């Protein structure tokens, strides 16, 4: 499997979930906390945290403040930014 195959598998993974897609699109606008994401997208904060953990495992998001208990800041990785560009075209 080459890099483009892996990229499109990750893109399909994100598109398979409305919440994952919306989080990626929302993070394309800058740094956000799980609470900000939850309020904006109408998703419970604990569910947002689980989704962010999944997206982090796929190397789509990065936590800038991992040692902070509340108010962690998340941003998209380079791959996450590419995914958001594809989602913007959908």
Regions found by a protein language model. Name each.
Residues 58-69:
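Beta-hairpin "wing" of winged helix-turn-helix
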Residues 73-90:
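Conserved segment of winged-helix/HTH DNA-binding domains
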Residues 18, 29-33:
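Short capping segments at the starts of secondary-structure elements
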């Amino acid at each position: 499997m080459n890099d483009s195959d892996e990229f499109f598998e990750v893109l399909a993974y994100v598109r398979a979930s409305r919440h994952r897609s919306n989080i990626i699109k929302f993070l394309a606008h800058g740094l956000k906390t799980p609470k900000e994401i939850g309020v904006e997208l109408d998703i419970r904060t604990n569910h947002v945290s689980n989704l962010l953990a999944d997206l982090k495992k796929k190397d789509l998001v990065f936590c800038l403040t991992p040692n902070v208990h509340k108010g962690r800041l998340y941003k998209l990785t380079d791959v996450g930014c590419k995914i958001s560009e594809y989602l913007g075209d959908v």
